[in-house]
């Protein structure tokens, strides 16, 4: 089936383990079990529809921004497995930096037990600021670095960890697993 509508919200973001994807929500009618694509007026795919997002937002058809899942899809098509790090993270916004003195980077909101990050010593509350020589400011930076690596690769991960009255910089060596 083909439906027409407008993008109702383009500002959402959904975070998962080792990933975060931009969301698009539209006012298009949908079938609860349907999958597909949202295209612009030029016929270009701009989102991959998922019922996971759609069902959470009443009658809004939702999907992951195509730009965010492109590398994942290309890797799957080429038979390349996804490297596994094992964290959930969220970017530190500028208000938190300015008002609370929290360093810029990717805040680790959860670490999966038994994951490469867990085994290396990374903890919930750490702020990832660099991987190897690349500055990490958000989940996109993190995913770019992870998508370019293979399982078994060793990454030098720099975090800032809260101590009594400051943040200490710690470097961990994380050996990536396979998802």
Protein language model regions, located:
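Conserved PDZ fold ligand-binding element
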Residues: 42-46, 117-139
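C-terminal cap/linker of serine protease catalytic domains
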Residues: 45-103, 166-167
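Beta-strand/loop subdomains of soluble extracytoplasmic proteins
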Residues: 1-13, 21-22, 67-72, 83, ...
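Soluble non-cytosolic domains of exported or imported proteins
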Residues: 1, 33, 63-67, 119, ...
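Solvent-exposed coil/turn segments that connect beta secondary-structure elements
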Residues: 8-13, 29-31, 42, 51-53, ...
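Active-site region of chymotrypsin-like
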Residues: 2-62, 102-109
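A short glycine-leucine-enriched loop at secondary-structure breakpoints
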Residues: 35-38, 99-102, 116-127, 148-150
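PDZ-domain C-terminal substructure recognizer with occasional recognition of PDZ-binding tails
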Residues: 74-84, 88, 94-96, 129-131, ...
């Amino acid at each position: 089936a083909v439906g027409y509508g407008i993008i109702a919200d383009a500002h959402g973001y959904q975070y998962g383990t080792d990933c975060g994807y931009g969301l698009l929500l539209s006012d298009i009618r949908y079938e609860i079990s349907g999958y597909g694509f949202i295209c612009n007026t030029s016929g270009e795919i701009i989102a991959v529809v998922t019922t996971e997002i759609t069902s959470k937002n009443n009658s809004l058809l939702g999907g992951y921004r195509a730009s965010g899942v492109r590398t994942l899809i290309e890797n799957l098509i080429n038979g390349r497995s996804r490297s596994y790090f094992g964290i959930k993270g969220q970017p530190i916004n500028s208000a938190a930096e300015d008002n609370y003195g929290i360093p810029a980077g990717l805040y680790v909101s959860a670490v999966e037990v038994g994951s490469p990050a867990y085994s290396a010593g990374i903890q919930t509350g750490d702020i990832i600021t660099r991987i190897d020589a690349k500055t990490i400011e958000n989940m996109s930076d993190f995913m770019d670095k992870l998508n370019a690596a293979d399982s078994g690769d060793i990454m030098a991960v720099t975090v800032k960890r809260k101590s009594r009255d400051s943040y200490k910089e710690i470097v961990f060596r994380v050996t990536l697993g396979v998802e």
